Amino acid sequence: MNHFELFNLPVALDIDLASLKSNFLSLQQQYHPDKAADKDQALIKSSEINQAFKTLSQVDSRAAYLLALKKQDHHLDQSISDFEFLQSALELREQLDEATSSEHLRTLRLEVQQWIDGLVREFKIDYSEEDWSEARDTVRKLRFFQRVLNDIDKAEDQLLDDEDSFDLDDDF
């Protein structure tokens, strides 16, 4: 049984994330080790459910998993050789490093999301045409942007922490 089947979802890049979450919570309850007669087996199943959920939750890992189902996921860890992309990626990283406000981070997030949306469209075309080399390249780019989104989240958290500690200092 693949991850999509586990959560009763179509084998596709576009999935209903609310259904994924709902089915995940239901399966978590069903296979919770504390409620099972065979705790070891329930622990294994629970771990599989958690891993499948993590994989399907993010578009980059979901795309990579789709390639894995077609046995086309080899060399996904190779570096990206698209010079224009690398140049844009470097500029984006510099903008993130220089971001000092929530507004700047929001703008950056929107830009990254636009990149991701474009790459998702590219992946769907590559996947449907079975252009595996291009699909793998697109997954590599999606992974890069997912990491940037994660770093934006961290930067936002850091800004909030800094603002909170600054507000505390104002009270003294």
UniProtKB/Swiss-Prot annotation:
Q: Which PROSITE patterns has this protein been placed in?
A: DNAJ_2 (PS50076)
Superkingdom: Bacteria
* Biological processes, Gene Ontology terms: [2Fe-2S] cluster assembly; protein complex oligomerization; protein folding
The record ties this protein, via InterPro entries, to:
DnaJ_domain, HscB, HscB_C_sf, HscB_oligo_C, J_dom_sf
Which Pfam families does its entry note? DnaJ, HSCB_C
What is a single molecular function from GO for this protein?
protein-folding chaperone binding
**UniProt keywords, alphabetically:** Chaperone
According to the entry, every stretch annotated as the J domain falls at 2-69
| NCBIfam families associated with the record | hscB
Subunit and interaction comment: Interacts with HscA and stimulates its ATPase activity.
Matches recorded under HAMAP family: HscB
Family assignment from sequence similarity = Belongs to the HscB family.
Q: What is this protein called?
A: Co-chaperone protein HscB homolog
According to the entry, what is the taxonomic lineage of the organism? Bacteria, Pseudomonadati, Pseudomonadota, Gammaproteobacteria, Moraxellales
